[in-house]
Amino acid sequence: MIIWLTSYPKSGNTWLRALLSTYFFLKEEEFNFNILDEIPNFIQSRYFSPLVELSKLKTNPLEITNYWNAAQSRINLSGQTKFFKTHNACVSYKDKWFTTKENTSGYIYIVRDPRAIVCSQAVHSNIKIEK
């Protein structure tokens, strides 16, 4: 089953991934940023490539909604609890829900003051807040 780490971009998702990855997966004494790979971004192509030709998704990105749940079902075949990062909301698009109770064990919603998000995004994008 999947536990989702979900947030608006620049809200602390990477920070929480670092904490959870260290707690659950660190086998050495020293932190290494590669451990963040233990909580991958769900939208990575490796989860969708067995289901659809990826070039089809590049020409029509919203087509991915047709494969959200099939990809999650494949992930859950292992029977293990897995964490995934996403910026997707638990919503439907053209009657296709992002996830289902059969695929999801829980959510961790990360919330940050929107004013801080704007500042963080501005620094990240190297633009002035005034713009």
Where are these regions (language model features)?
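PAPS-dependent sulfotransferase catalytic domain
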Residues: 1-131
